[in-house]
């Protein structure tokens, strides 16, 4: 059974291992989506329903998972809005990864990282199959315990940095905002496939489908 301590434990802290500094690969700037700025705190949500069986069948015809298939579809959809000039930069998606699949934990806290599949469209010569294959190769290469551990360590190292750890909250917020803006230049959009969500039976009577 899960204890309250297990549920409140920090998965990052449990699996963090200090490593020697390694040079980070410099990532190229990604294509940025433009739109009308909305009021602070407001969101625009678009909902759609897709028959899962049909989606699964389409993914299967390419020999990939539904997540890989949908990631490729999203990349191509963004490309359709781009001009030839904008094709000078790749389209890159941030795809969250549930670290519980690699590092067992009962924590109820956030415990995820991400990978960044992308595609550099050039002149519209690419077929959808090319994009699917590139995305699938990225998933296979990045979704390993070794790669996830490195990303996790890089992320948590900031939290335990001796300067930031004891810095005032105001300074931390400034550093976080600067880091967020820098990270945004490497990514075009975020895509998250939550997959099948199973709730405890005791919650079922309170959930409406």
Show where each model-derived region lies:
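Gly/Ser/Thr-rich phosphate-binding loops and adjoining beta-strand/alpha-helix segments
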Residues: 31-100
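Acyl-thioester-dependent acyl-group transfer interface
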Residues: 1, 47, 56, 79-209
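Generic intrinsically disordered, low-complexity segments enriched for polar/acidic and small residues
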Residues: 9-13, 66, 203-206
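Short amphipathic alpha-helices and their capping loops
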Residues: 1-44
